[in-house]
Amino acid sequence: MGLPWYRVHTVVLNDPGRLLAVHIMHTALVSGWAGSMALYELAVFDPSDPVLDPMWRQGMFVIPFMTRLGITDSWGGWSISGGTVTNPGIWSYEGVAGTHIVFSGLCFLAAIWHWVYWDLAIFSDDRTGKPSLDLPKIFGIHLFLAGVACFGFGAFHVTGLYGPGIWVSDPYGLTGKVQAVNPAWGAEGFDPFVPGGIASHHIAAGTLGILAGLFHLSVRPPQRLYKGLRMGNIETVLSSSIAAVFFAAFVVAGTMWYGSATTPIELFGPTRYQWDQGYFQQEIYRRVSNGLSENLSLSEAWSKIPEKLAFYDYIGNNPAKGGLFRAGSMDNGDGIAVGWLGHPVFRDKEGRELFVRRMPTFFETFPVVLVDEEGIVRADVPFRRAESKYSVEQVGVTVEFYGGELNGVSYSDPATVKKYARRSQLGEIFELDRATLKSDGVFRSSPRGWFTFGHATFALLFFFGHIWHGARTLFRDVFAGIDPDLDAQVEFGTFQKVGDPTTRKQAV
């Protein structure tokens, strides 16, 4: 037909039956990818250590999304929380993956059917006998159905009225589990970290969608508005649909990167801001000081810190530490975490407790500096030993571990002290297994980083797509010389000027 590759979609422009067919095929591809990806991830996922080797450390991408919607069990007999299960049924990881693949197959067959039987009576205008779609009516139908689905999700699935609920956790990602959520109708519902807002917003948005859908089904648009917004042109639908998608992509990129109730850290890993603000470090110190006030020893207080909380306070779990083009999971970077060595406490020969200054997010290397509780530099690992005044050897720094595997162990050997001081720059110290996966020691990002990068990038591309197609549909007559009221079926590519039989192209 002589179409360039970037204009091939014009073949379905005036063909409602085949336009439907290609969209059904697209749904088949999306659903098939989701199911296949889920099965692949389940094949490589190791559920044995949900604390030190959770799904986000292993680079799982679709498993966290299934889990946040209430799926926790596998046909393999394991549960995401670390327990064992028997007969999880269809509401399981494999069950949902399988239903997506079956649905994909059905959509594939439906797409073929609609491609073959494209000339259906439903697409024909009774008055003219030509193919046409009542786009405002279709908009009303879709808005109504989307509203029903949205309302149903918020009122039944999230609330547990008919469904499992959603993943809910505490602010430090320690006690997460799937549970029913009551809608939050007050001001707290607008807090992005309050799960109740998910239920209330879906109920409210769904109700609005249902009412808006009924409005558009019962009220016809004014003629001037219909013509002004080109409501009879399918490219108007494309443009506004792209707008909806890019807006949603920008929103979820934000909720993922900055964190929200919809992106729990147990499923997607911590955010970079939790490292930047010392979020987990403050909570750990608060718990230790509470333990000391209850007359626990320093060793006992640190031993009560959950390993899960200590692991969050490690820079290797910061999604901003991985480069955008470093492929692979976090486990492929710094290795699989095996155990917490404990919290190192450094002291100089005068008995002052020293604190290692932590590495900021965007540094690859950082000077090792130890300060006292007033922030005064007391020791360092100097770049030039000849000019040093605060070296570990000169200041007589020692280190003692509290909690973890090295609880009660102390070192005064300068080389060992410096080793642990360097590692303290990166947060709590963990033993990491690099051999199993041949990990290269270079930090990787978590699924939180990948999701944000992907959605922000595609949102930007789709923004330009919205502008492009919006301009094309609003100024179609200017760009192509086509009368905006032209309703004849034309074959694109046959004529140099669309619809003008006097400009037939010559066969080469």
Curated annotation (Swiss-Prot):
Keyword Methyltransferase set for record: no
Please state the protein's primary subcellular location: plastid
Instruction: Cite the Pfam families for this sequence.
Output: PSII
- The regions listed as transmembrane in this protein's record are 21-36, 101-115, 140-156, 203-218, 237-252, 457-472
What's the record's note on cofactor binding?
Answer: Binds multiple chlorophylls. PSII binds additional chlorophylls, carotenoids and specific lipids.
Can you cite a GO biological process for this protein?
photosynthetic electron transport in photosystem II
Example GO molecular function term? electron transporter, transferring electrons within the cyclic electron transport pathway of photosynthesis activity
Q: Name one GO cellular component term.
A: chloroplast thylakoid membrane
Q: State what this protein does.
A: One of the components of the core complex of photosystem II (PSII). It binds chlorophyll and helps catalyze the primary light-induced photochemical processes of PSII. PSII is a light-driven water:plastoquinone oxidoreductase, using light energy to abstract electrons from H(2)O, generating O(2) and a proton gradient subsequently used for ATP formation.
Which family is this protein grouped under? Belongs to the PsbB/PsbC family. PsbB subfamily.
Subunit description: PSII is composed of 1 copy each of membrane proteins PsbA, PsbB, PsbC, PsbD, PsbE, PsbF, PsbH, PsbI, PsbJ, PsbK, PsbL, PsbM, PsbT, PsbX, PsbY, PsbZ, Psb30/Ycf12, at least 3 peripheral proteins of the oxygen-evolving complex and a large number of cofactors. It forms dimeric complexes.
Q: Which PANTHER family does the annotation name?
A: PHOTOSYSTEM II CP43 REACTION CENTER PROTEIN
Q: What is the recorded name of this protein?
A: Photosystem II CP47 reaction center protein
Report the source organism. Answer: Brachypodium distachyon (Purple false brome)
Name of the coding gene = psbB
